[in-house]
């Protein structure tokens, strides 16, 4: 996956959030539709058994009520099919976004590991430089001590020579 800038990652996360909300809303609509469909199926069954008279004929009003319920049930079934398609599409989109998110997480993990390796290498170099500087300092300190001792000897020698020859 190509590297994403923080702005692109933010937009990607917003899209993922939006798609999740749409998926949730679609699922809620599907549940409501399923419940309504079941209720209407029960009404159709109830009305057909209730309004069925001894002569096997329906009165005009009873037949219209059954037709109306059956028509509404058919419309709900069609809407149910569309909602299922929407749900499948949203699930596919959600899966794609989840895969994209996984790719981003892998990229971030790889980037973090690479940066940690670089930081460790830099830290080791810093330690080496620090140790070299400390060694140089100690060496210079010893040379300085020797020079101070030499200067003190010269000073003593000069003081003695001044005392001996006024």
Swiss-Prot record:
<dbReference type="GO" id="GO:0005829">
    <property type="term" value="C:cytosol"/>
</dbReference>
<keyword id="KW-0963">Cytoplasm</keyword>
<dbReference type="GO" id="GO:0031030">
    <property type="term" value="P:negative regulation of septation initiation signaling"/>
</dbReference>
<keyword id="KW-0539">Nucleus</keyword>
<dbReference type="GO" id="GO:0061509">
    <property type="term" value="P:asymmetric protein localization to old mitotic spindle pole body"/>
</dbReference>
<dbReference type="GO" id="GO:0044732">
    <property type="term" value="C:mitotic spindle pole body"/>
</dbReference>
<protein>
    <recommendedName>
        <fullName>Uncharacterized protein C2C4.10c</fullName>
    </recommendedName>
</protein>
<dbReference type="GO" id="GO:0071957">
    <property type="term" value="C:old mitotic spindle pole body"/>
</dbReference>
<dbReference type="GO" id="GO:0090443">
    <property type="term" value="C:FAR/SIN/STRIPAK complex"/>
</dbReference>
<dbReference type="GO" id="GO:0005634">
    <property type="term" value="C:nucleus"/>
</dbReference>
């Amino acid at each position: 996956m190509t590297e994403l800038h923080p702005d692109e990652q933010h937009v990607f996360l917003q899209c993922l959030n939006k798609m999740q909300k749409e998926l949730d809303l679609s699922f809620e609509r599907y549940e409501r539709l399923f419940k309504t469909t079941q209720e209407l199926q029960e009404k159709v069954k109830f009305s057909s058994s209730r309004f069925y008279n001894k002569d096997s004929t329906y009165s005009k009003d009873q037949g219209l009520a059954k037709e109306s319920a059956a028509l509404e049930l058919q419309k709900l079934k069609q809407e149910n099919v569309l909602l299922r398609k929407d749900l499948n599409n949203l699930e596919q989109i959600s899966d794609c976004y989840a895969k994209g998110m996984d790719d981003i997480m892998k990229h971030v993990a790889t980037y973090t590991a690479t940066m940690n390796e670089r930081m460790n290498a830099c830290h080791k170099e810093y330690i080496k430089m620090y140790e070299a500087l400390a060694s140089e300092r100690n060496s210079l300190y010893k040379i300085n001590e020797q020079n101070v001792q030499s200067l003190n000897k010269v000073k003593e020698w000069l003081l003695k020579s001044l005392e001996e020859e006024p």
